[in-house]
Amino acid sequence: SLVGSEMCIRDSLNAVDLILFVVPTKAIRNVAKQVNDYLSRSGERPVLVHASKGIEIGSHLRISQMLEEEINPNYYRGLATLSGPSHAEEVSREMLTMVTAASQSLSLAQEVQGIFMNQYLRVYTNTDLLGVELGGALKNVIAIASGIIEGLGYGDNSRAALITRGLAEISRLGIDMGADPLTFSGLSGLGDLIVTATSSHSRNYQAGVYLGQGFCLEDVQIKINMAIEGLSTCQAAYELSLKRQVEMPITKALYQLLYQEAEVETLVKLLMQREGKSEARVDHFI
């Protein structure tokens, strides 16, 4: 019965050491509210871990912040995320994979590390939860742009340049928000960006390929038929860039393509014709 099922879920959630959230960003709040209803203060409190990658439109909150809003802090011991280059297709086949367990608490990150690390999954720790979550979310935006480059028929030079400059604008926003610059050269930054922006396993990259080939957004979503996190993250990231006055030209161009009906070839020309700049300063990408 429904009542019996709910009691089973409640008993299960209150008998575990860790609850893992692996749902699309748009579903996080609803799932978290249900979990909150089932949890209680009695017994050992679990650790909440998420492997979702996105930023909420409007609020601009990261996944951990949404979980904090929806779940009573008396019901859990702490929050962490697992992030990095980890396509499910390969993890499920026990192919060698490395990810980062991030939490503001080092001891909690180490606890999660110990739970998930095994002979085919190596887990590192990081206390820069902000940077790890931003890297995981924003790389989906750059992955769509990388797919567009492929769909347009440009070569390896173009894609390498786009990924590199994409990392620069991810880093710019992250540093402005208080993240550790080194986080973006790690597994949850550069590592996740490389695999998501180059692999046919990536829904975001494949969506970009279709867009570059001339398919409209509605048709692309039908073809992929699964969540494409980069679409909503692009809007949230663009809003954040305006709010914080951080220059993110690739994100802006993709936003104009997706939501303002700009022509992709025109956007490519505008990106290439931007004023000349120095590539980097010692303290951060520019």
What spans do the regions from the language model cover?
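Internal alpha-helical scaffold of NAD(P)-dependent oxidoreductase catalytic cores
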Residues: 38, 70-78, 96-183
